[in-house]
């Protein structure tokens, strides 16, 4: 296909103290959040004031953006927990028809298809499934996590889950940073620990 493989091109986005996510250097300041070990991902990625995460967004995209491969997030973070943790989510903000997460994104239909031959103990007819579609205001594109094995300052690179997806023009790309991610990984910091990120990193 003419659009595959994707021509390699790396773009670096830097978080800003005003909540922006821009091409260029990061702000020469730090921001902090307080870990909430019971916070859901849905709460963390919803816009508005939230002391339990940091959220950065680009401006509205003037043209479609294709993300292909594994995003990386580099940060310098300081904490005081015996063992700390950081989670990051890359988010597409913008209303669109998407595959919904409910029921693992599919539902069982009333029709059946035959796969091979039936036997006395195995019926080859199976109900068909279809994608569960619906409009949603956002979509998580990728996630990543890191465990911080001792208190202090850590400089690290988080390799996020690979994806190949197009973010439409008019949407915003967002990055949420949290501590515990109880829906995805084991919680190792169950306290209200303050995490500080140096945006110059």
What is each model feature region?
Residues 1-201:
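C-terminal, loop-rich substrate-recognition/catalytic regions characterized by aromatic stacking residues
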């Amino acid at each position: 296909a003419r659009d595959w493989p994707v021509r390699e091109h790396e773009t670096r986005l830097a978080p800003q103290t005003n909540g922006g996510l821009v091409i260029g250097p990061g702000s020469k300041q730090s921001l902090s959040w307080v870990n909430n070990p019971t916070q859901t991902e849905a709460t963390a990625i919803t816009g508005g004031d939230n002391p339990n995460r940091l959220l950065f967004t680009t401006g509205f995209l003037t043209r479609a953006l294709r993300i292909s491969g594994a995003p990386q997030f580099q940060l310098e973070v300081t904490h005081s927990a015996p063992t700390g943790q950081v989670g990051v989510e890359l988010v597409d903000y913008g209303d669109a028809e998407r595959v919904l997460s409910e029921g693992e994104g599919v539902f069982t239909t009333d029709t059946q298809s035959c796969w091979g031959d039936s036997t006395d103990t195995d019926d080859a007819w199976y109900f068909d499934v279809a994608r569960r579609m619906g409009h949603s205001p956002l979509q998580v594109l990728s996630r990543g996590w890191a465990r911080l094995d001792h208190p202090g300052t850590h400089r690290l690179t988080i390799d996020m889950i690979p994806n190949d997806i197009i973010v439409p023009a008019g949407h915003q790309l967002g990055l949420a940073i949290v501590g515990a991610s109880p829906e995805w990984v084991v919680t190792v910091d169950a306290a209200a620990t303050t995490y500080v990120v140096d945006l110059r990193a």
